[in-house]
UniProtKB/Swiss-Prot annotation:
One term of GO molecular function: hydrolase activity, hydrolyzing O-glycosyl compounds
Pfam families recorded: Glyco_hydro_16, XET_C
Reactions that this protein is recorded to catalyse: breaks a beta-(1->4) bond in the backbone of a xyloglucan and transfers the xyloglucanyl segment on to O-4 of the non-reducing terminal glucose residue of an acceptor, which can be a xyloglucan or an oligosaccharide of xyloglucan
Native source organism of the sequence: Populus tremula x Populus tremuloides (Hybrid aspen)
Gene field: XTH16-34
Name of this protein: Xyloglucan endotransglucosylase protein 34
Domain GH16: 23-221
GO biological process: cell wall biogenesis; cell wall organization; xyloglucan metabolic process
């Protein structure tokens, strides 16, 4: 699948054109790790560089590691730059996600599934609402995510959740409460990232196992941007709801250009979409038509 990596002329044209959600997203603010995040486990497997502006997560046969945000948030724009585990990364998973803290939790997931050397990474996204997930989408990326840092971002407001890679929307999940589909709106979420061994499922359904002779596996991070409405975990609303930039009209839907970008990702790089899986869902889930993500 080497063809999944090269930049195409079409993408080059897209990048030169400006526009996201009818208006540009606020540019991420590059801040050090310690400004917004703390380690959560295996502290000795996190390495710090450039005064904490860049970190590495290390995975070996004994443990992986991870970190989480200091605060909990209801809505906002969250991003970080990541460079994934290079070489033979089969069996490893690098995750960047938002999650609340109870049994009926909400969750917004980026999961990067490692692969054998020369085979492309798979990016899996998922959305959990009220404890229910099963909304997986999988894509290849149009570049090698192990060579350089790239931005991975989530825009979350009362109207939709947008997953972005270098400002290209790869997925949208609309608020479809009127269709009986739960939407994350009242459970503050922390932001997490981790690197761990998942060779029971991550690569070819668990057929490819982690080669520990290649350890340590290293994922790199920088630009730990959070622009969100911070709340206590007991809060059921955001005190500034409606007043933040992400609440404004131009961020309530993708614009035509953004839908063209999303369609390009769907047509060129999507390898699985729950919306089109009739074996799992004989009837299309109601949110899929509204998301225009089919």
């Amino acid at each position: 699948m080497a063809a999944a990596y090269p930049w195409t002329l079409f993408l080059g044209m897209l990048v030169m054109v400006s526009g996201t959600m009818g208006a540009a997203l606020r540019k991420p603010v590059d801040v050090a790790f310690g400004r917004n995040y703390v380690p959560t486990w295996a502290f000795d497997h996190i390495k710090y560089f450039n005064g904490g502006n860049e970190i590495q997560l290390h995975l070996d046969k004994y443990t992986g590691t991870g970190f989480q945000s200091k605060g909990s948030y209801l809505f906002g724009h969250f991003s970080m730059q990541m460079k994934l585990v290079p070489g033979d990364s089969a069996g490893t998973v690098t995750a960047f996600y938002l999650s609340s803290q109870n049994s009926e939790h909400d969750e917004i997931d980026f999961e990067f599934l490692g692969n054998r050397t020369g085979q492309p990474y798979i990016l899996q996204t998922n959305v959990f609402t009220g404890g229910k997930g099963d909304r997986e989408q999988r894509i290849y990326l149009w570049f090698d995510p192990t060579k350089e840092f790239h931005y991975y971002s989530v825009l979350w407001n009362m109207y939709m959740i947008v997953f972005l890679v270098d400002d290209v929307p790869i997925r949208v999940f609309k608020n479809c409460k009127d269709l009986g589909v739960k939407f994350p709106f009242n459970q503050p979420m922390k932001i997490y990232s981790s690197l761990w061994n998942a060779d029971d499922w991550a690569t070819r359904g668990g057929l490819e196992k982690t080669d520990w002779s290649k350890a340590p596996f290293i994922a790199s991070y920088r630009s730990f941007h959070i622009d969100g409405c911070e709340a206590s975990v007991e809060a059921k609303f955001c005190a500034t709801q409606g007043a933040r930039w992400w609440d404004q009209k131009e961020f309530q839907d993708l614009d035509a250009f953004q839908y063209r970008r999303l369609s390009w990702v769907r047509q060129k790089y999507t390898i699985y979409n729950y919306c089109t899986d009739r074996s799992r869902y004989p009837s299309m889930p109601p949110e899929c038509k509204r998301d225009r993500d089919i």
